[in-house]
C-alpha cells in the first residue's frame, strides 16, 4: 500500500486522542529508533512512567513463580481482602517491550473496577524468548496459583484472562491452550481483550491504517512477528494464528475491544464475527476516535477509563453466571 493512499487518521482522531498524540513529556528524549532492544525497553519504561502515575492504591505482592523456563515474576493486586475471582493480566508491547511497571495503572484500575485480585505476569520477552514460551509460562503461573491459592488468599474456582495488544493474543492463546491440553487451573469465566492481534497476515485495516504515530506499519508488524516466532511454520500454529484453532466450541466468554483507527481492528472484528457465528458468548465494542494502545492514557482520556470499566463489567457479570 502506497503510504499516500492510507487514511489520514491524525485528522480524524477524537479531541482526547489528539491531545495525547500532541502531548510532550518534559525532558523526555526522542524514541531511540536506532538503539538496541534493551535501550528501547528502557525508553518505553521511562515514557510510561507519566501515564502510570496517580493510580489507585491497594495491597500488592510480588511473587517469583517457578516455570519450566525459570522463575517468572508476578504481581498480585488485591483491592480487598477477599476476592470472588482471579484475573490474570498479560501486558502488550509487541512481544518485545513492556513489563509489570509499564502496565501498572491498567492493572490497578482493572482490580479496582472488578473488585477482584489481578495477577500481572511478567512473561519472558522476545526475541530472547520465542513462541510458545510466553504461553507456557502463563500456563505454569496459572497452575502454580491454582495449587497455592490458600497461601495467597486467592479464589481460583473462577479465573479469567485479560490483555492488551500482543497481551490480548497471549490471553486468548493461553485460555485455548488450557482447553486444548486439558489443563485445569479453574473455571475460565471470561477473557478481556483490548485491541489484540489474533493471526491475520493481511487485512483492509492493515492496509489503510498504521504509521509512525502508532508504531504499527507493515514493517513494524513484520518485525514483531519475526522476533516472536521460531520459524515461518509457527505462523499457522493454532496458538498464534488463533483463527486456525477451534473457535466453534468451549471458548470462554470474550469481551473484544477495538480502536477505530487501529490497523489491527480487523483481527478483532473477525474474532467477534467468528465467535458470534458459532454461538460462542462474546461482546464487541469499538471505541471511536482512538488509536491502538489508547488504554494506557486514562490520565487524559475518559474513553480509556470507559474501556476498562466496560471490560470489568463484562467480567463481573460472568462471575454471577454459572458456566
UniProtKB/Swiss-Prot annotation:
SUPFAM superfamilies: alpha/beta-Hydrolases. Gene3D superfamilies: alpha/beta hydrolase. Pfam families: Abhydrolase_3 (PF07859). Belongs to the 'GDXG' lipolytic enzyme family. It comes from Salmonella typhimurium (strain LT2 / SGSC1412 / ATCC 700720). This is Acetyl esterase. Displays esterase activity towards short chain fatty esters (acyl chain length of up to 8 carbons). Able to hydrolyze triacetylglycerol (triacetin) and tributyrylglycerol (tributyrin), but not trioleylglycerol (triolein) or cholesterol oleate. Negatively regulates MalT activity by antagonizing maltotriose binding. Inhibits MelA galactosidase activity. The gene is aes. GO terms for cellular component: cytoplasm. PANTHER family: AB HYDROLASE SUPERFAMILY PROTEIN C4A8.06C, ALPHA_BETA HYDROLASE FOLD-3 DOMAIN-CONTAINING PROTEIN-RELATED. Its EC number is 3.1.1.-.
